[in-house]
């Protein structure tokens, strides 16, 4: 059986739950996997945030060029959703005058083949000093308080705890929820008043969640073999 990873955004939402609630959430996610991805926007984060090799800017990418690339996505819903959040992020970074500098942070290893990332490979310099930003592009069902706490804790462990220039960096998450009229907005949360989760607890939460997740996937594979339907519930990573 191919062991499909959970999206990091789903892990942050599900891992802090109590065991029974965690299993229910994993079953619900398995049965309702989204029909499109925000990966096209994630791949364009350096352009959207105007991330530079250093504090000296080498020029900006025009929004029209990014939009043109996203319009070529074959899935119309995916194209429209990615364009919507990408433009919001593009404008947010420039209106708030953040300067993004490339930094290959990599992923936080949690063991058992699990590695997570709630940040882009850039550090953002603004009026309050350096900030680490993670991005949740979902319209609904995005980070709640406990999921943000999980993500902030991962940011702290992987980047602040390195003991380098970013030990005092602010921790931030940028979300793009929908308003009642259906339009999206930028919502920014910081970890200033959040009690962070210790690293060993973070690892335990992730391992317990993945243990149940792999069990659910294995049961699904067994059912498919018995009924002759074959294949996995999910055809790609």
Swiss-Prot record:
Q: What induces it?
A: Induced by DNA damaging agent mitomycin C, part of the socA-socB operon.
Gene Ontology cellular component annotations, sorted alphabetically: cytoplasm
Which keywords does this Swiss-Prot/TrEMBL entry list?
Answer: Cytoplasm, Toxin-antitoxin system
Signal peptide position in this chain? none
| Cellular location(s) | Cytoplasm
Give the knockout phenotype: Deletion of this gene allows growth of cells disrupted for clpP or clpX, deletions which are otherwise lethal.
Post-translational modification as stated in the protein's UniProt record: Degraded by ClpXP, recognition of SocB by ClpX requires SocA.
Q: What is the role of the protein in this entry?
A: Toxic component of an atypical type II toxin-antitoxin (TA) system. Upon overexpression in the absence of its cognate antitoxin SocA, leads to inhibition of colony formation, cellular filamentation, incomplete DNA replication and induction of the SOS response. Exercises toxicity by binding the beta sliding clamp (dnaN), blocking DNA replication and leading to premature replication fork collapse and incomplete cell division. Unlike most type II TA systems, the SocB toxin is unstable and targeted by its cognate antitoxin SocA for degradation by ClpXP. Not toxic upon expression in E.coli.
**Partners and quaternary state?**
Interacts with cognate antitoxin SocA and with beta sliding clamp (dnaN).
Instruction: Provide the protein name.
Output: DNA replication inhibitor toxin SocB
Record gene name: socB
